[in-house]
């Protein structure tokens, strides 16, 4: 991956991060500015577009997942499965565990209770979706949960030798997306985090297909059909599940 492409992906991360921050902290303010008749019509249009783009931080998350799917596919061109897993573990878990424990200590210091081990252990291992474990870190933990499942899956893809078999891998990702769309939404929650695995996994897969397409590892027609279908699945599911 050349420096120009790395720089572009860094820009995408900055845009994604900015949209997430705007969505969680300033979306109501942007909506108010967009509906304020005292503002110039051009500014109102700009604020409105920004409010829509950052609503719930969803667009930022989509960009993050697209970039992640792309980068992980690139990384696995060179790294073996064991090496890949080891690097992901040491890149994510130490800082994440520190942040979760720090959050618990702060909550305890402010009069809160330390959760039981039945919550702490799945939370620290990022497997809480399988145990109905409440999210930590103000809810942002969910993105790491889905990322870890994606890493496990992609490591297996590498292990069985499909990482460079673009057509087979793309069709596999498409069928997995179709299968996910037919089963019960996962995980079940009462707020924005409802069914995030069901809704956002296709974007990780789209990132994979984009990489395969760029490096001419997949037929472009197969790639286009798969990307359009996976995006359509997201739109149809988000309307059906309606996490907002």
Predicted segments, located by residue:
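Membrane-interface helix-loop-helix regions
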Residues: 32, 36-59, 86, 91-148, ...
């Amino acid at each position: 991956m050349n420096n120009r492409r790395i720089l572009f992906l860094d820009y995408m991360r900055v845009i994604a991060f900015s949209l997430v921050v705007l969505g969680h902290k300033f979306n109501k303010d942007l909506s108010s500015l967009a509906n304020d008749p005292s503002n110039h019509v051009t500014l109102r249009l700009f604020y409105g577009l920004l409010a829509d783009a950052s609503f719930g931080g969803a667009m930022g998350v989509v960009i993050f997942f697209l970039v992640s799917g792309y980068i992980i596919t690139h990384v696995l061109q060179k790294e073996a499965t064991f090496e890949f897993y080891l690097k992901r573990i040491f890149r994510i878990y130490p800082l994440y565990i520190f942040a979760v424990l720090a959050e618990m200590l702060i909550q305890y210091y402010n009069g809160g209770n330390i959760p039981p081990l039945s919550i702490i252990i799945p939370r620290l291992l990022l497997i809480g979706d399988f145990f109905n474990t409440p999210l930590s870190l103000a809810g942002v933990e969910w993105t790491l949960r889905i990322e870890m499942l994606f890493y496990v899956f992609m490591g297996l893809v590498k292990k069985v030798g499909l990482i460079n078999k673009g057509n087979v891998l793309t069709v596999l990702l498409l069928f997995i997306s179709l299968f996910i769309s037919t089963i019960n939404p996962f995980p079940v929650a009462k707020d924005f985090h409802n069914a995030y695995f069901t809704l956002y996994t296709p974007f990780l897969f789209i990132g994979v297909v984009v990489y395969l397409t760029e490096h001419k590892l997949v037929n472009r027609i197969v790639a286009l059909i798969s990307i359009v279908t996976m995006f359509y699945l997201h739109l149809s599911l988000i309307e059906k599940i309606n996490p907002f």
